[in-house]
A protein has these predicted regions:
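Glycine-rich phosphate/pyrophosphate-handling loop used in enzymes and phosphotransfer proteins
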Residues: 1-172
Length: 172
């Protein structure tokens, strides 16, 4: 039947969940089916940028961009999680951060599907956007591109194509 996983696929996902349970991207505690860690949630609230999350152009260089936004300040548990995704091979952390970013910036409802967080579709949120283009980063050393992994949940929630090769990285 369409939309349902086969018995063997369900069993494989359950085994993966048992062997590799979901962890908090910020402190690595086992979460199970909780969307966020009860210990880190208050820490994240302290790092929230407030109701307006657009980056201040007087403090951040945006180049040719019309604007940019970030749900949290780059400090504390947020900084640690990003650095682990970049330098410690935790690609799952980048995806979980992308889900959290999508929920905070666009108000996506986060759902659990077989022990994986998935942001729900956000009707109408993509108006004015054509695609999602992650900032180019090197993936040679780590085997994956952190910004691309973070952008995947956002593209899914907005129903937009993800174009990871639309920009190329240039060293100045």
């Amino acid at each position: 039947m369409a939309g349902y996983y086969s018995r063997s696929a369900q069993l494989a996902r359950q085994m993966r969940q048992l062997l590799f349970p979901r962890r908090c991207p910020f402190c690595r505690r086992v979460l199970g089916t909780l969307p966020l860690c009860e210990v880190c949630t208050p820490r994240l609230e302290e790092l929230r940028r407030g109701p307006v999350m657009r980056l201040d152009v007087s403090r951040h260089y945006l180049g040719a961009l019309d604007g940019a936004a970030a749900p949290y300040r780059y400090e504390g548990v947020v900084r640690s999680a990003i650095l682990r995704a970049k330098y410690e091979g935790e690609s799952w952390t980048a995806v979980e951060l992308g889900v959290e970013m999508t929920a905070r910036l666009f108000g996506a409802e986060v759902e659990m599907h077989f022990a994986e967080l998935v942001p729900g579709l956000i009707p109408g949120a993509a108006i004015g956007y054509d695609c999602i283009v992650p900032v180019p980063a090197t993936s040679r050393r780590r085997g994956y591109n952190v910004p691309e992994r973070m952008a995947q949940p956002l593209a899914h929630a907005l129903g937009l194509p993800l174009l990871p090769k639309a920009l190329c990285r240039v060293r100045a």
